Design a protein with these regions (language model features):
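Conserved acetyl-CoA pyrophosphate-binding loop and the N-cap/start of the following alpha-helix
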Residues: 80-89
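A conserved beta-strand-loop-helix scaffold within acyl/acetyltransferase catalytic domains
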Residues: 39-51, 56-74
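Short amphipathic alpha-helix that is part of the acyltransferase structural core
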Residues: 1-32, 126
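Conserved active-site alpha-helix within GNAT-family acetyltransferase domains
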Residues: 102-132
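Residue-level recognition of the GNAT/N-acetyltransferase active site
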Residues: 77
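Conserved acyl-CoA
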Residues: 88-104, 113
Length: 132
């Protein structure tokens, strides 16, 4: 299977991306309008199965392009997991010329071992305020 990663794909299918994100525990109820707005305000990476022209992965970064960036919504279609696509997706994101010299942040409850392979480490001084 061949796949390609496209940065800031302007021709992505909003329905396909929403469906993919809705398969995750963190975005299972995310509305299409919200997905559209997050894409518009983020640096995004779309992964496509080139044989089927199907969206199979996605990740995005929120940044000021000066100090930090926050990685979020990293997902690979369940059917394609275990093939190294997530690894390649994260490598592409963290090695992006616009981000490589910035501090990367992320929040995960189940993928810590995965991100440690890229140099991420646990930091206990994170605070959160939930939305209303």
């Amino acid at each position: 299977m061949e796949y390609k990663i496209i940065k800031n794909d302007t021709e992505y299918n909003l329905d396909d991306l929403t469906k993919l994100l809705n398969t995750s525990y963190w975005a299972k109820d995310r509305k299409k309008e919200t997905v559209k707005k997050t894409v518009e305000n983020s640096l995004c990476y779309f992964v496509y199965d080139t044989d089927k022209n199907k969206l199979i992965g996605f990740a995005r970064a929120i940044t000021d392009y000066t100090t930090n960036y926050y990685i979020c919504d990293v997902i690979v279609d369940e059917e394609y997991r275990g093939e190294g696509i997530g690894k390649k997706l994260v490598e592409t994101l963290i090695n992006d010329e616009e981000l490589i010299h910035l501090r990367a942040l992320l929040i995960t409850k189940d993928a810590k071992k995965f991100y440690e392979k890229f140099g991420f480490y646990n930091k206990e001084d994170v605070m959160q305020k939930d939305k209303k």
